[in-house]
């Protein structure tokens, strides 16, 4: 499993798809209605904290988890905008399938998974 994670993490770099990230604030972006609902939900700040705590070690422009060179699938979760852009993936992979974090390396708690599920389900109609 770990070897698969390593291969997936460096694949974007091998393809040459890693781009320099430009800082963009939420006020500069036209969010769709679903993203706006997610942003304005009462749980958003807690979800952001969970993602920063449990996902950033791998899903960063410069991952700091040992052996991860590039964010898996080039999914970077460093800003609120990143979280909104990848909300569905976060929901499916952490709250529904429990595929992330792999082997629960970041010790994501059940209540954190439930909060992510609640945040997404309540605000996506």
Where are these regions (language model features)?
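Aromatic- and Gly/Pro-enriched helix-to-coil junctions and flexible linker segments
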Residues: 1-125
């Amino acid at each position: 499993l770990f070897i698969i994670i390593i291969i997936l993490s460096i694949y974007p770099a091998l393809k040459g798809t890693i781009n320099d990230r430009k800082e963009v604030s939420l006020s500069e972006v036209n969010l769709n209605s679903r993203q706006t609902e997610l942003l304005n939900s009462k749980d958003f700040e807690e979800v952001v904290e969970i993602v920063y705590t449990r996902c950033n070690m791998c899903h960063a422009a410069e991952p700091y988890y040992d052996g991860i060179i590039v964010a898996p699938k080039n999914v970077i979760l460093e800003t609120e905008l990143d979280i909104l852009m990848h909300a569905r993936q976060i929901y499916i992979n952490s709250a529904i399938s429990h595929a992330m974090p792999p082997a629960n390396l970041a010790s994501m708690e059940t209540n954190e998974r439930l909060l992510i599920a609640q945040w997404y389900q309540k605000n996506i109609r």
